[in-house]
């Protein structure tokens, strides 16, 4: 199956609670590549690449996040990103 990339913007109480770390771990567990990073406005940006099914699994996970977080909203942006990420980084 063809690899796709998606960008997600996660809002809520998602910084300072290990959200990027847990997202990286979940991404690797799902066989995805990409990154998670904190944004200046308090949101977290996640870019992930993999099969559509695995991206959907990550999207569903992001809506809950780790127990330490309180996710208010996850926006999924269509992405034409074509980057060959190695692993799942925290930026």
Swiss-Prot record:
Molecular-function GO terms, alphabetical:
acylphosphatase activity
Stretches assigned to the Acylphosphatase-like domain: 5-91
- This protein's source sits in the domain of life called Bacteria
Catalytic residues, chain numbering: 38
- Tell me the keywords, alphabetical order: Hydrolase
EC number(s) given by UniProt: 3.6.1.7
Extract the InterPro entries matched here: Acylphosphatase (IPR020456), Acylphosphatase-like_dom (IPR001792), Acylphosphatase-like_dom_sf (IPR036046), Acylphosphatase_CS (IPR017968)
Please give the family membership noted in the entry: Belongs to the acylphosphatase family.
Q: What is this protein called?
A: Acylphosphatase
Species source reads Vibrio cholerae serotype O1 (strain ATCC 39541 / Classical Ogawa 395 / O395)
What's the encoding gene here?
Answer: acyP
